[in-house]
Amino acid sequence: MNMKKEIIVYSISDSLGGTSQKLLSAVTAQYPDIIFNNSYRFPFINKEEELLAILRDAIKDDALVISTLVDSKLAAVAREFSQANGLAYLDLMHPFFEIIREKTGTSPIEVPGTLHRLDTEYFNKISAIEFAVKYDDGKAPQGFLDSDLVLLGVSRTSKTPLSIYLANKGYKVSNLPLIPEVPLPQVLEKVDPERIIGLLCEPEKLSKIRSNRLNSLGLTQSTSYTDLEKIYEELDYSKEVFKKYRAHVINITDKSIEETAFLIEDHLKKLR
């Protein structure tokens, strides 16, 4: 049986990003034989360094980037970076703005989020998204102490998309990749165990996910990254870490991001 092709989609906005989601839903409905991984959503992006970090990750994931940035400077940065690096990038706003300008001589006000009421929930979401981007992939372990959740797992256990998805729900989430050769940050010992989530995946499934990842990057040679014996070692190590830090463990095998997030939220509700 032929495996369905998968396209990873990054959605970037300086507001909620609802515009791109509506378009994407309409487009994906026309391709029933393609899997669109739409877990990577980055709303409230208003700093150039945040934007460039996301675009660099998009290159690594061979992703399609959809943008509804209304800020012309940020949009130009994204467009120029994408052109220079061969990144598939679709700007949904500025080509339309340009047509209006040519016809009327009027420029847009470039104010993000004018469709949405600026309430407490909105600003909490902004803060949570910025937090997830800042503390993704163990970049700054001191952020663990301010996190609602700390996600732990070996490579390709959905740590980043889960962080972003949960951030869209207002949770401050950081994550740390578990690599046997890399020492764990000491600050992890100070984190409330009930806030630590350990992510597991069946070895064979994880090997397949990693192989697909390498194939998407044009790398077809076998490496330790996809070697089943090495993956067993990584997962055994992660189980030791989970036990040491008393993490709440979730097996993500064959679960969608939404399903895993539901289980995490259910765990949090039981703590109240």
Swiss-Prot record:
Role played: Bifunctional serine/threonine kinase and phosphorylase involved in the regulation of the pyruvate, phosphate dikinase (PPDK) by catalyzing its phosphorylation/dephosphorylation.
UniProt GO molecular function: ADP binding; ATP binding; phosphotransferase activity, phosphate group as acceptor; protein serine/threonine kinase activity
Keyword Kinase listed: yes
Family stated for the protein in its record: Belongs to the pyruvate, phosphate/water dikinase regulatory protein family. PDRP subfamily.
Keyword check for Disulfide bond: no
InterPro entries per record: Kinase-pyrophosphorylase, PPDK_reg
The protein, known as: Putative pyruvate, phosphate dikinase regulatory protein
Keywords assigned: Kinase, Nucleotide-binding, Serine/threonine-protein kinase, Transferase
Catalysis performed (reactions): N(tele)-phospho-L-histidyl/L-threonyl-[pyruvate, phosphate dikinase] + ADP = N(tele)-phospho-L-histidyl/O-phospho-L-threonyl-[pyruvate, phosphate dikinase] + AMP + H(+); N(tele)-phospho-L-histidyl/O-phospho-L-threonyl-[pyruvate, phosphate dikinase] + phosphate + H(+) = N(tele)-phospho-L-histidyl/L-threonyl-[pyruvate, phosphate dikinase] + diphosphate
EC number: 2.7.11.32, 2.7.4.27
Annotated ADP binding sites: 153-160
